[in-house]
Every structure is written in structure tokens, then in C-alpha cells.
Amino acid sequence: MIIKNLNQKIITIDNSSPYQKFIRIYRWNPNLNLNPWFSIFPISTNNCGPMILDALIQIKNIQDSSLTFRRSCREGICGSCSMNIDGTNSLACLRSLNTKSNFITIYPLPHTYIIKDLVPDLSNFYAQYKLIKPWLINKIGFSLKENLQSKIDRLELDGLYECILCACCSASCPSYWWNQDKYLGPAILLQAYRWIVDSRDNSTENRLNFLNNKMRLFRCHTIMNCSKTCPKSLNPGKAIASIKYRIINN
């Protein structure tokens, strides 16, 4: 099979090779007066790293330097390389090239404004993160001694503090797609719950009062796409349900 890219380069596709992959990438450049298009790049898994991010880096270094995407740690820690890979929001550094299909299709995170190619505009996402005041609030004031937690109190934070704000869950949530100007979304609400349950924080009531809103919190309809797609295997849906429970029973 022969495919011609936007730049008129001809790519011959050999589906018979188990080591040959073809990366189909969504492209858009605000400086070009063109509709979005797809570029297809051949990759040999014999001379490429094992992850999707390795393939993207090789494509940018060797085949098309104009390809634009975010990346940093390459270890699933920073959350920079979040994108939609074969229909699932994930981190490119954690998704293997070893798939059953020879074709891998990559989009930017869905329902986000696109800066270029695979780079979403997360300005609104981080502005919402700021709204929840993601830091310890101690009305009494801090002493010169450590602010200790018991082991039981510390365990309450497990499954919450590991969130890396990659936005995979929020970008998979239909409620967030439709209402991201008002609904905080699963990632931000999970982060909010992380501070609500922290025994060292003295502003739990204020945090719950802020979230007690039909749009900020209760726009969640428990679709649970968030928990299904989280690359860190966290459960934002459970965190949101816990916030609702605390508000209703407060």
C-alpha cells in the first residue's frame, strides 16, 4: 500500500513486517492556512526505543523536525506527554510500541484547544487548579517543630498525592467536555480531595463550601471514564464521590 503525505512524500507500507510500525499523527499548524491533517511515519522497532514517546522523538529527530509535542521526564512522573493514543488518553512514555496493529493513531487530548500538533492548551486546567488552593492552610500558624501525621492519617493520602496533573482523566470526561468553563473536572477534584483529607490542613470546611456547587462538583455524573483512563491507576471517581458524601453529611 502506498500513502502520500501532505508534503507529497510517498510512503510504501509493508504490513508483512512484524517490526514495522506506522505512526499516524494528527497535525495542525496555526501559521499555515490549512485544515488539520494526518502525517504517517514509518518506524522500525528494531532501531527505536520501546515506547510511543521514543517513536515520536525519533520521528522529530530524523523524519520531521516540525512535529510538535510536549515531553520531559520520560518516566511517567511529569505528565507532559499526555495525548490520545489509539482512542485512549495516556502518557506516551508509558505506552508500548508493541501493539497488535501495525498502525498507531495519535491525537492531542480531546476537547481541548490546540496550540500546535499534539500540544493542548491547558491554561484553563491550571487556572482551575489554582482555584482549589493546592497547599496546606494552617489558620493557627506554623510552629518551629514538625507538623507530624500519624501513619493512619498519612495512609489517607495514598491514591491522591500521586496525581501528576496530566489531564488525561479530565479530557476523557463528557461532563468536562461540555462544561469546562464551570465544572472543575476529575483531576482538579481529586487534587481538592487530597487537601480535604490531609490531617495537617485546617481549612476543610472552607474547601467543602467552595466545592458545594452544582457546577463545580455536582456536574459529575459518575461516568467513570476518568478512573478507566488514568495512567497512574488512580480513582478520581471515588475521590469525587467522597467529596459529595462529606458535603451531604456535613
From Swiss-Prot:
One of its GO terms (biological process) is respiratory electron transport chain. [2Fe-2S] cluster binds at residues 73, 78, 81, 93. It comes from Chondrus crispus. NCBIfam families: dhsB (TIGR00384), PRK05950.1 (NF004616). This is Succinate dehydrogenase [ubiquinone] iron-sulfur subunit. The gene is SDH2. It is an enzyme of class 1 (oxidoreductase). It is a peripheral membrane protein. One of its GO terms (molecular function) is 4 iron, 4 sulfur cluster binding. PROSITE patterns: 2FE2S_FER_1, 2FE2S_FER_2, 4FE4S_FER_1, 4FE4S_FER_2. It is found in: Mitochondrion inner membrane. CDD domains: fer2. GO terms for cellular component: mitochondrial inner membrane. Belongs to the succinate dehydrogenase/fumarate reductase iron-sulfur protein family. A ubiquinone binds at residue 178. InterPro entries: 2Fe-2S_ferredoxin-like_sf, 2Fe-2S_ferredoxin-type, 2Fe2S_fd_BS, 4Fe4S_Fe-S-bd, 4Fe4S_Fe_S_CS, Beta-grasp_dom_sf, Helical_ferredxn, SDH/FRD_Iron-Sulfur. Pathway: Carbohydrate metabolism; tricarboxylic acid cycle; fumarate from succinate (eukaryal route): step 1/1.
